[in-house]
Amino acid sequence: VIKRIKKTGNFANRFAIELLNKAFDKQLNILYETTFGNIETAINLLDAFKEKQYQIYVIALPINIELSILRNQQRYESKISAGNTLPRIVEREVIERMAVNYQQCLEQLRQDKYIHLYQIKDHQEVNQIVRSILQNNG
């Protein structure tokens, strides 16, 4: 059973964890999307899957810091235009730090023999990786 991480007290996190625990109880296959920007969060999440004896496949997407900054700016401007939500801009340093944390997290996960880590370098690799996972799984 996953417990809420102290640093993350938002509704979305609590809701996701409740759904995940229900899926564990029903022994469902689970697809979980996360940024893995924090190794503690990643380990907490993956340990829960290991305890339940799940096969774990991590598909890591490439990082493009400049594109992340551009999309952040576009979201900010879109929210200002909409006028119905509070816009929030993430500073460049925060995005860069998250990118470094993500890479460090992947390096640590790569060392774990219970985790099948696939790193996508370009979109052409996606089908190849999916075929590989399906062949290894069944």
Located regions from the model:
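Hydrophobic anchor at the start of a short beta-strand
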Residues: 30, 53-56, 117
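Conserved GTP-binding G-domain of TRAFAC-class P-loop NTPases and closely related GTPase folds
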Residues: 70-138
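Conserved phosphate-donor/acceptor-positioning beta-strand/loop module used by diverse small-molecule
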Residues: 50-72
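Conserved nucleotide-binding/hydrolysis micro-motifs of P-loop NTPases
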Residues: 37-38, 62-67, 124-126
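Conserved nucleotide-sensing/catalytic segment adjacent to the nucleotide-binding pocket
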Residues: 1-50
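A signal for specific C-terminal beta-sheet/loop modules enriched in small/flexible residues
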Residues: 48-53, 57, 132-138
